[in-house]
């Protein structure tokens, strides 16, 4: 299975995987509107891979088969200062 990977020009680090290049028929219109004009990044052979960067490859394959697309969003931003305060038990009270 080879899929096309597009990046969003509106949402940083957001990627849309579709079954075939330039085929967005199965992608909801609202998602395409939010995503903005897709920019092709690469054609990706999934069968030759056992992992991807941030995405679970089995989930990507499953979503492509079931829905015709997979949306990869960036991980949430971690506030390292707040995390450190919590770890050391700091409280303003």
UniProtKB/Swiss-Prot annotation:
Domain of life: Bacteria
Disulfide partners: none
Protein name stated in the entry: YcgL domain-containing protein Swoo_2115
Family matches, as SUPFAM superfamilies: YcgL-like
Residue ranges that the Swiss-Prot or TrEMBL entry lists as coiled coil: none
Protein's organism: Shewanella woodyi (strain ATCC 51908 / MS32)
PANTHER family assigned: PROTEIN YCGL
Residue stretches making up the YcgL domain: 1-85
């Amino acid at each position: 299975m080879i899929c096309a990977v597009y990046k969003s020009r509106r949402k940083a680090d957001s990627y849309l995987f579709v079954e075939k290049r330039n085929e967005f028929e199965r992608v909801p219109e609202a998602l395409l509107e939010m995503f903005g004009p897709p920019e092709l990044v690469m054609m990706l052979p999934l069968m030759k891979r056992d992992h991807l960067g941030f995405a679970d490859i089995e989930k990507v394959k499953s979503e492509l088969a079931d829905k015709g697309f997979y949306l990869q969003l960036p991980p949430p931003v971690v506030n390292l200062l707040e995390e450190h305060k919590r770890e050391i038990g700091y409280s303003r009270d």
